[in-house]
């Protein structure tokens, strides 16, 4: 399975984000944490609201956990500047003024966050509030003079060519130059100010924002609806490897505590934001004259293990490992310091059930300790798989310690030995194949011939230390007759055979397209797969059974305007074998270039996800890729199809 995990993680399009230049202002070495007024109070903050919620950060024990940046979002300013051109605050809403607000926050041991806009007006106008466009140098100095510690910088009223509309998701030019100007201005004020780029994911900012700011919003606003969690995670997929110390992909503010989500939904929301290393910005009313956060939601925000995953010194985001669209769950995972691993199994169905994590799906075979964070349980000696109950829309969040890489089976952990017979259990096979490579490590040098029997019914003799065996997709046992004691075995899955889209025939609207560049590894793809069209070919396999397919796809259907409704940043893709029931995969975004200005507009960027398919016969098999069910609430067209690797 190690090969498969590497295949999925090192897709040709997924080059390291660390290759790009990065700002180094000494801030946000771990993701910033704090509170922002927008999610609950919208653009109607006032001094009493900000002060009471800031005080609550301290009183509720949140500040000591790291929630320190307090930001007054839109609604604080006025339509005009002072006669000298300086920004000012709404004196009715903030009678003490912003410098006094900064002093108050600093006295509490908190940090003062201000909000501005790269356009002519702030978001939330009217009533009009002046923005920073063409006044960046002056405004940066003003923020510094007020004692600001961070600036959230928005993107409304910013496109000159279209007369500065409130929102333009397809601006005439990239937002980048406006953010470069403010970034440079902040660098010259002589005060460290954390810079939060908030241009809603336009022009794929992961390629340029890390050079300018400490975080960048990956997409449009989170909305008070459960579906926005799926939409946001789909947009996060191509962003995760750009994150690192000093620069973080911002999934937007938290809705935990606003009475929008159930408790399991809040746990899922908080867990995924944390392990993807998003800034953790509370968007709830913690305490004001009318409202206070519930104890249950407060406990979610204060969960120290989850905060620890977010603030981990290694600074590596979790990434999507595998998705089961028909079954309604998926797995995310990433490394932590101390050779630990964090894993999240999301239950997208709104029903309680047991879900199983196969450790090889996250590159592991064994964990000495598995800590279930929300389940508050600890399991030791986890071999190959872990099963737990999870609530509807909840998440199994695990910290794995003392792990071994996938494919490695030490005898003392996996084998039961009697005399010269050892039976290894919990042997994982991602696919049914007679081409698994078995390597034996003996306790001392040996050239003996051993006899191996697998649970698939195969018996083979191997001379030396390695040979091929047959395994069936799922859990297997291997019995070895031997004279020399065995220390461990190593099993490597088949590399399989790659079938490019060019060997597939197309029907209906589907058509082959040559890419100007990209579309790795073949330089072409099949697009326009409607619910009434498909791509088909015949593929020969050496064994019957279930086969693992690593599918190369492209999707850059970015949800901007549609994000307020049912936009999901996903596209449907189905595969069927020998006219069997199709397996559906709702793929996330793969685009890693600008959706507006790059030559391919992100539609040349390949990503890979795997599925297990049944119904394969020995010999020739009819394989069909399509968009079955695409008419039922999905995008008109399927994800573009580049090719597929069949592990046989």
Curated annotation (Swiss-Prot):
The keyword Glycoprotein applies. The active site is at residues 154, 221. Glycans are attached at residues 84, 90, 339, 350, 505, 572. Substrate binds at residues 199-203. CDD domains: CBM35_galactosidase-like, GH27. GO terms for molecular function: alpha-galactosidase activity. Pfam families: Melibiase_2, Melibiase_C. Transmembrane segments: none annotated. This is Probable alpha-galactosidase D. The lineage of its organism: Eukaryota, Fungi, Dikarya, Ascomycota, Pezizomycotina.
